[in-house]
Amino acid sequence: MDTAFPVCGIVAEYNPFHSGHRFHIERTREMLGEHTIIVCAMSGNFVQRGAPAIIDKYARTKMALEGGADLVLELPVPFATAAAPIFAEAGVSLLTRLGCVDALCFGS
């Protein structure tokens, strides 16, 4: 699917969303263009290894949107609570199956 602007996917937990996450989104736009659409695949109320998130998914979504994301999608619980390889694979799969994501950007 062609879009007028590039679409970049980010797989994250944002537990909680902080200035480093904001920097990651800003830097992604610097690299891909200021009109890049940022779509995040984020864990819900439970994160990797089944731990409860320290802030609920709605508040974390709001923080991500206020921090520069354009769309936040919830990674289903069985994948969000899995080990890192499964978490990552599911996040990438969710984003690529949207059919509009042009790039993925990861931080560390």
Positions of predicted regions on the chain:
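Nucleotidyltransferase catalytic core that binds NTPs
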Residues: 1-108
